């Protein structure tokens, strides 16, 4: 079984980060195929992604043995759980697993205000933007409040250090949120801060951050708050 994961720029692509971090941290075998974001109609990025995914978005997981592709980060996670049932993609306890899926679906489908006003940008340091957004955007405050409540509930039930004890898809899905809190210096509780620090030190997350900082790329479409690096 030879799996290839197509991803976008590590500095910006929060959806790519999720399955990559999960697979790397759990030791699942895969080959990374990184494509530089370029959203022009006939760009190499669009052509390469369209060749394997009708959705035209990253991430995409391809089984190179037969070319079968799975797209969308949550669909990829479920495919990995089926392929590697003992790897720990989801918590082993049925109730914990159901709760993990519930909060992952929340982040997958919701929190649009946080995503829109504070897009992932690992390399940037934007505390002034974060302070302004937090003060002016009530929906961002509500998004962050709900995220912190979900974290606190999971950590209280599991005892930590990850949301459900051991690292799982839930932590992989919230890793980009942790990056946003750090980039924009968003105010969070001490419990959330400890969790964010632990996620940041997770080997797979640390490796992703290192790669993101090394990209030295500037994608205008992903930079609503800066004119240059």
Which residues does each PLM region occupy?
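GST-like domain detector, emphasizing the conserved glutathione-binding G-site
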Residues: 1-134
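Short, contiguous strand/loop micro-motifs
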Residues: 5-7, 33, 165, 182-183, ...
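Conserved beta-strand edge residues that scaffold enzyme active sites
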Residues: 36-38, 195, 213
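Active-site-flanking alpha-helical
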Residues: 81, 177-178, 209
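Short, hydrophobic secondary-structure boundary micro-motifs
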Residues: 87-92, 115-117, 159-164, 206-211
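GST-like fold's C-terminal all-alpha helical module
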Residues: 107, 111-201
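Acidic/histidine-enriched, glycine/proline-rich intrinsically disordered or flexible terminal extensions
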Residues: 212-229
């Amino acid at each position: 079984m030879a799996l290839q994961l197509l991803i976008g720029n590590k500095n910006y692509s929060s959806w790519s980060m999720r399955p990559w971090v999960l697979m790397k941290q759990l030791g699942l075998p895969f080959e990374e195929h990184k494509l530089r974001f370029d959203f022009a109609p006939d760009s190499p990025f669009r052509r390469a992604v369209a060749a394997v995914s009708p959705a035209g978005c990253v991430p995409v997981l391809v089984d190179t043995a037969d070319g079968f592709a799975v797209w969308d980060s949550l669909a990829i996670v479920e495919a990995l759980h089926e392929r590697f049932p003992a790897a720990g993609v989801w918590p082993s306890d049925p109730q914990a697993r159901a709760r993990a899926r519930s909060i992952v679906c929340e982040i997958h489908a919701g929190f649009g205000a946080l995503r829109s006003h504070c897009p992932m940008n690992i390399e940037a340091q934007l505390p002034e933007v974060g302070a302004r957004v937090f003060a002016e955007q009530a929906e961002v405050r509500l998004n962050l409040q709900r995220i912190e409540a979900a974290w606190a509930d999971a950590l209280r039930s599991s005892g930590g250090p990850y949301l459900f004890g051991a690292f799982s898809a839930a932590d992989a899905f919230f890793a980009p949120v942790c990056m946003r809190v750090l980039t924009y210096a968003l105010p969070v509780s001490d419990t959330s801060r400890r969790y964010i620090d632990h996620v940041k030190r997770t080997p797979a997350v640390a490796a992703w951050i290192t790669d993101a900082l090394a990209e030295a790329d500037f994608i205008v479409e992903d930079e609503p708050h800066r004119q240059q690096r």
